[in-house]
């Protein structure tokens, strides 16, 4: 004797069963590091992280001198003060998928995919993308980019005045 089972779905239940898994979120960040006319220029250390009220800060990337012998570049990470206080002091560097080399002046595009590195999947709500730069023998600056995440994604932009130029972010699926 052979027993067989059939399940018949109709309407929205059928559409739900056929739906593909939700695509990963991608956060594209465009960051401008201004060219400076100073006698001794050092590339800035840059930290990018996400904050949401009531949730721990999530480091997306920390750009510093990763090639310095004996991880010597990590010594100066505490100069990226706001990031250091928010989440840096608890991070072991170099962190896989998070640490990267410093960048030269110019416009840079960085992309973060949910589930990789430090990028979480963002539920709808209000977030702040924090971008902080600090330079040896230079200044430091923090730029806050507000992101109102909806099911459709989010967009935000802000601009620095000295160590950072324009910063924009686009969250999409």
Set out the residue ranges of the language-model regions.
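Short amphipathic, basic-aromatic surface patches that mediate peripheral association
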Residues: 29-41, 64-67
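Beta-strand signatures of extracellular beta-sandwich domains
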Residues: 47-49, 61, 130
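Sec/Tat signal peptide C-region and signal peptidase I cleavage site
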Residues: 18-24
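Secreted peptidase-domain scaffold signal
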Residues: 28-29, 168
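Glycine-rich, aromatic-bearing surface loops/beta-hairpins
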Residues: 105-110, 118-173
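Short coil-to-beta strand junction motifs in C2/discoidin
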Residues: 40-47, 124-126
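Structured domain cores in non-transmembrane regions
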Residues: 53-122
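Bacterial N-terminal signal peptides that target proteins for export
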Residues: 1-11
């Amino acid at each position: 004797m052979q027993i067989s089972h059939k399940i018949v779905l109709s309407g929205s239940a059928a559409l739900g069963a056929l739906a593909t898994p939700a695509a990963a979120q991608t956060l594209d960040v465009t960051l401008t590091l201004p060219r400076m006319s100073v006698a001794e220029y050092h590339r800035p250390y840059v930290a990018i992280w996400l904050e949401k009220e009531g949730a721990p800060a999530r480091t997306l990337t920390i750009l510093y001198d990763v090639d310095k012998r004996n991880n010597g570049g990590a010594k100066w990470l505490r100069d990226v003060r706001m990031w250091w206080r928010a989440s840096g002091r608890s991070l072991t560097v170099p962190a896989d998928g998070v640490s990267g080399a410093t960048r030269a002046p110019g416009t840079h595009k960085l992309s973060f995919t949910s589930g990789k590195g430090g990028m979480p999947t963002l539920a709808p709500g209000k977030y702040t993308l924090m971008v902080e730069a600090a330079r040896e023998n230079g200044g430091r600056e923090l730029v806050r980019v507000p992101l109102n995440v909806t099911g459709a994604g989010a967009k935000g932009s802000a601009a620095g005045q000295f160590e950072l130029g324009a910063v924009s972010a686009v969250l999409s699926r």
